[in-house]
Amino acid sequence: MFWPDTINRKLGIQYPVIQAPMFGVSTVQMVAAAAKAGCLGSLALADLSADQSVELIRETKKLTDKLFAANIFVHHIPEVTDALKEKFVRTKQFLEQLAKENNIEVELPGLDAISIHPYHEQVDVIIEENCKILSFTFGNLDDQSIQKLKENGITLIGTCTSVNEALQLEKSGIDIICVQGIEAGGHRGSFEAEHIPQIGGLSLLSQVYDHVNVPLIYAGGIYGARTLQAVKDLGAQGFQVGNLLLASQESALQPFEKERLKKVREEEIVLTKSFSGRYARGVKNQFIETVENSEYILPYPYQNKLTNALRKAAKSLQNPEFVGIWVGQSIHQYSELSTEEILRNLITECER
């Protein structure tokens, strides 16, 4: 049999293939389509409010009766100090001027208008809404949340970008670890926002496999049978794909963003903190080049909240220079088939 069965049995799915939780790209329709293909769909809840999380969970359950993972950010929320307030004002002024110079009309929010939601609200929602799988990134859950979730029979999937992070997750009793290589698209799942591990995926996977006794999912660069086989040989028992689905019918990317993806070159794929305040891998553009090495980057989630309106305005203008188009290092042809078809094709290719 081609597929390892540890993850299948733990998660109650047919194939140990996981649709990556890509906030802003994956949709409830994508989650349901992944489930229909016999894979695990992942509902990206990021750092949404409890009410927003409930709405998306219920929408997903209307589309599928199969299990899916809810995915949340478990980041540290920086204290609002006088220094942060001053930097926020300067950054807001700089970004508004940058937008104006590039014919983007937008009013960015003040600090008082920004809502920050601790992940504990989402933990309560996930229990109340009877979700059975929770995946998380940007750190580790606190002990009390882990206990509550386990008491309610919820399987926990943590994200690591280093061996040390994997060991911390294992020590906390996390059921499954998702190993994210630095080549992966989107946000780095690192516990630290600043000094992120730089280790490549294959090196990291083999080392984590040697150090922990927890089933491993691998994320970063899987786009076909050869890449999946490579990480399977190194110990992965589950396989998370994101890039593969970026241009799918269920993707939230707009046509101009999908077209930009098709033309992307290797040297244009970069790590940046400019949009959100945390490192993420995506397509280099004017915004990144202007902001990345400036003093106008706030800590996450404040930078993310501040730039949100600018990104939305740029998207409405179909301006790829001021939106975050997240993509990993593995450049390939981006299929515009449905998520279900793309995943079934991957499964068929692997089983040949």
Put a short name on every predicted segment:
Residues 187-217, 222-352:
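Conserved active-site-proximal phosphate/metal-binding subdomains
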Residues 1-194, 198-211:
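Active-site entrance/lid segments in N-terminal catalytic domains of soluble metabolic enzymes
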